[in-house]
Swiss-Prot record:
It comes from Bacillus subtilis (strain 168). Encoded in the SPbeta prophage; retention of this TA system may prevent the bacterium from losing SPbeta from its genome. Induction: Accumulates by 4 hours post-innoculation and into stationary phase in rich media; maximum expression occurs at 6 hours. Low expression early in rich and minimal medium, higher expression after. The antitoxin antisense RNA SR4 is constitutively expressed at a constant level in all growth conditions and media tested. bsrG mRNA levels decrease rapidly upon 48 degrees Celsius heat shock. SR4 RNA not only base pairs with bsrG mRNA promoting its degradation, but also inhibits its translation as it sequesters the Shine-Dalgarno sequence. The lineage of its organism: Bacteria, Bacillati, Bacillota, Bacilli, Bacillales. InterPro entries: BsrE-like. Pfam families: Hol_Tox. The chain crosses the membrane at residues 11-31. Keywords: Cell membrane, Membrane, Toxin-antitoxin system, Transmembrane, Transmembrane helix. Toxic component of a type I toxin-antitoxin (TA) system; expression in the absence of cognate antisense antitoxin SR4 RNA leads to cell lysis. Induced expression causes membrane invaginations that dislocate the cell wall synthesis machinery, leading to eventual death. Unlike many type I TA systems it does not form pores. Base pairing occurs between the 3' UTRs of bsrG mRNA and SR4 RNA, which leads to initiation of degradation by RNase III (rnc) followed by the action of RNase Y (rny) and RNase R (rnr). Not toxic when expressed in E.coli. The keyword Transmembrane helix applies. The gene is bsrG. This is Small toxic protein BsrG.
Length: 38
């Protein structure tokens, strides 16, 4: 495995973690907004 390939894997893995964090953040925002409406 070259340095470039390992770097690309690191970037892809970091993007996956970032997407997961954003997804959880969006779900939390929806839950809090729905609780305020009640």
């Amino acid at each position: 495995m070259t340095v470039y390939e390992s770097l690309m894997i690191m970037i892809n893995f970091g993007g996956l973690i970032l997407n997961t964090v954003l997804l959880i953040f969006n779900i939390m925002m929806i839950v809090t907004s729905s609780q305020k409406k009640k």
